[in-house]
């Protein structure tokens, strides 16, 4: 398939890591098993050269209905996601095992998966030669297409499907066409955000980052991608509320919203919520994108995509993928950097301000590339707490999948699942894997670890193409995350936070913001 180069003029990745030019998104090539006893199988992943013993996949699915419900209760209520997986790793002495994934009965037809919970087995989920991605974006169930205008959106398409290439190229065009607006619009919108947070902090003694940030993120995306200020349209400031409600209707089987189990289980985990309840909200969003995306819709015409289908895909990519990702990522970044302490804050502030000063007071892509600690901190945030925790793929053929300690036979048609935080905090790959280490990716040795940063549905050292499922906006997300850190430490020497929980990401309040003193 054809590929397209990154829409950004300067690579976001160290040159020492990649020898080939940027394309976009990850592909791992199939390696044939050399053992004569398994000539019909493909080795899904292989690191090192030692022969690993073939082991039966441990675990079980329990009784129909009862087993999936028990696993769902463990996942949401009795253990929580991380302990759910870790306890079974201890039980089976294996990072590969069989388990049921939510939502199970009665929303998902088949909740049974083979879980891949280490950094060696996990990457098979990116290899579209080995796994199919059709209708697996949300896992073992797919929300009704009534929530997306009757269309299967790009995120649910396998690269083998004809529309995948056209729709992904449309997103590449969107990114390319917006590149000159990203820097000025980010600085304008996030300067307004921090001005308002300072006022709130002075009045109340603390400032809620999440609520204010949601509106800022949408304003930035609308202005950067489409050249439209939502305040000047019928949408006004309503987008975050409309999107949050719509996302809830898409993802409610996978969320816990803090209600008692006896209420939450029948309400959001047992049956799908009726799409009709958000139809009018979605229509308001659709009309905004239809009216704002003129240049992009002209490109859709050229690609042979109807304007209606293109608009639904632009809405999903902007609101679900990008805004939703920023809603999770930015509060998590504030949390992790806040907890790193004032010494780290001072180092970031010194690096950012000195680089900008030496660049004549101007922030450019070239200047950002010189901010080694800033870049490392962003990658560490993405490693430690990836905004997307789950990846799914259905085996296209019989496979042998290797963990660090054993190899496992998987049959064609079996569902594979990976919980990304365990893969990117694999202690056999990362030293101090469960610690946030700001300088982890600084220097040549640090750069070599970037291939194990997997948040984008592929290694950080790879790039998206129309032939894979790596996030089309991977480089965009890394860029805006860097801009976010830069904006904070251009303005402040340090800050303090209070952290709570949220169904999507973290709830963060600023308890202090110390303005720049040098």
From Swiss-Prot:
* Residues annotated as binding heme b: 133, 164, 168, 469, 471
- Give the E.C. number(s): 4.2.1.92
Provide the transit peptide span: 1-33
Q: Quote the catalytic activity from the record.
A: (13S)-hydroperoxy-(9Z,11E,15Z)-octadecatrienoate = (9Z,13S,15Z)-12,13-epoxyoctadeca-9,11,15-trienoate + H2O; (13S)-hydroperoxy-(9Z,11E)-octadecadienoate = (9Z,13S)-12,13-epoxyoctadeca-9,11-dienoate + H2O
According to its UniProt record, where is this protein located? Plastid, Chloroplast, Plastoglobule
Q: Which cofactor does it need?
A: heme b
Q: Which UniProt keywords apply?
A: Chloroplast, Fatty acid biosynthesis, Fatty acid metabolism, Heme, Iron, Lipid biosynthesis, Lipid metabolism, Lyase, Metal-binding, Oxylipin biosynthesis, Plastid, Transit peptide
Q: Where does (13S)-hydroperoxy-(9Z,11E)-octadecadienoate bind?
A: 321, 389
Induction, as annotated: By wounding.
A single BP term in Gene Ontology: jasmonic acid biosynthetic process
Q: Which domain of life is it from?
A: Eukaryota
GO terms under cellular component: chloroplast; chloroplast envelope; chloroplast thylakoid; chloroplast thylakoid membrane; mitochondrion; plastid; plastoglobule; thylakoid
List of residues binding (13S)-hydroperoxy-(9Z,11E,15Z)-octadecatrienoate: 321, 389
State which pathway it belongs to: Lipid metabolism; oxylipin biosynthesis
Q: Does the keyword Lipid metabolism apply?
A: yes
Single GO MF descriptor: oxidoreductase activity, acting on paired donors, with incorporation or reduction of molecular oxygen
The record's PANTHER family line, in alphabetical order, gives: ALLENE OXIDE SYNTHASE, CHLOROPLASTIC, CYTOCHROME P450 26
Function of the molecule: Cytochrome P450 enzyme involved in the biosynthesis of oxylipin jasmonates, important phytohormones acting as growth regulators and signaling molecules for plant defense. Functions as an allene oxide synthase that converts hydroperoxy fatty acids to unstable allene epoxides. Catalyzes the dehydration of 13-HPOTE ((13S)-hydroperoxy-(9Z,11E,15Z)-octadecatrienoate), as well as 13-HPODE ((13S)-hydroperoxy-(9Z,11E)-octadecadienoate).
**Full protein name:** Allene oxide synthase, chloroplastic
